[in-house]
Structures are given as C-alpha cells and as structure tokens.
C-alpha cells in the first residue's frame, strides 16, 4: 500500500497527517483555518486520496506557520508513500473551470522541486486568508515531496474561485501523476532513478 503517517511537533505547530494515495477521497481535516480546511477537502476529493490532517498551530499569531507546515508534512507523506516511484505515471496535467475562473496545473514527480505560482490575486484576501499563503503551501509540498509544480490562473475575477480552481487542478494533476502505469515496470526516468 502507498501510505504514510507523519507527525511534526514544533513550538509553532503540532501536526499529525495520514495519507493513502490509493484512497477514495475520505478523511478528516482540522487545521483551525476554515478556508484552508476547505481547500484540503477539495484536494483529497479530487485527487482521490485518503487524507487525515490534525493541526494545532499558532493561528492567533498568523496563519503562515500552519499553512506552510501542513504543506511540509503533506510533502513528506507524499514522498514516503511514493517510495522509489516505480511504476508511476510521473506527469500530470489538469485544467479546471470554476465558474468564471480557469486554472491549470502541471506536475512532474521527477524528484526536482520547483514551483511556479501565477495569479494576479496573490495580494487578495478570502475572508481573513491571504491568497499568497497558498503559494507557501505548494512550495513546501514541492520541496518535501520532490515534485515540480506549475500552477496558473488563466482567467478569473473572484479570488475564492481562483483558489478553488488551483486546488482542484492540482488535485486532478496529482491524481494522474501518482497513478500506476501497468506498462511502466521500473522508474519512469531515462536515468534509472528519481
């Protein structure tokens, strides 16, 4: 089974996360940040991963530590669950409309962390949540999960819809990239390792 369970305890956050890449979109998410919980719910549903996240963070100070640290732990769990990455599809792409918003994500699970996060909405807030924090989440996932991620807003007016489109497109692209390819007997790289 492609699963992982990670705990992280610092002075800023206490996180427990369980991940099953071959899940059904089930699990419980509790970070103390309503909008972020909503985004993680979209992630598990559209990636068809089982994901349980419990986080106690210093959200009275700021949301940054919680969002970034959950990204770090999710990335670690993803990397652990993928193991040697044998037999995976490796690449994924999705373009997702959300009302007036259109977002797309490309993913490469080739072991090289890099993030491109393009939206003119970075400076906006969704209620009390800074859109820019999502870039920090994806950067943390990329570094610890060893993946290249390009997220792009193609169109959109409403910041909430753009955030949803980004998470849904990321989830759908991740679902493709982690999928088993029955024809791939080894590691999907000409180098022989990832």
What are these regions (language model features)?
Residues 1-194:
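Structural preference for solvent-exposed beta-strand-turn elements
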């Amino acid at each position: 089974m492609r699963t992982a369970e990670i705990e992280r305890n610092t002075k800023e956050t206490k996180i427990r996360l369980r991940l099953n890449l071959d899940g059904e979109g089930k699990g419980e998410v509790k970070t103390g940040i309503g909008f972020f919980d909503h985004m993680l719910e979209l992630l598990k549903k559209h990636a068809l991963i089982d994901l349980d996240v419990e986080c106690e963070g210093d959200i009275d100070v700021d949301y940054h530590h919680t969002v970034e640290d959950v990204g770090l732990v999710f990335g670690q769990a993803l990397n652990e669950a993928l193991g040697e990455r044998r037999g995976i599809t490796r690449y994924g792409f999705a373009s997702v409309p959300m009302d007036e918003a259109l977002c797309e994500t490309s993913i490469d699970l080739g072991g090289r962390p890099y993030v491109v996060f393009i939206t003119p909405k970075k400076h906006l807030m969704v209620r009390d949540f800074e859109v820019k924090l999502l870039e920090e989440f994806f950067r943390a996932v990329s570094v610890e999960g060893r993946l290249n991620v390009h997220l792009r807003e193609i169109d959109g007016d409403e910041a909430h819809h753009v955030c949803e489109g980004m998470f849904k497109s990321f989830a759908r692209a991740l679902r493709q990239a982690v999928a088993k390819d029955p024809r791939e007997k080894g590691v999907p790289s000409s180098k022989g390792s990832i």
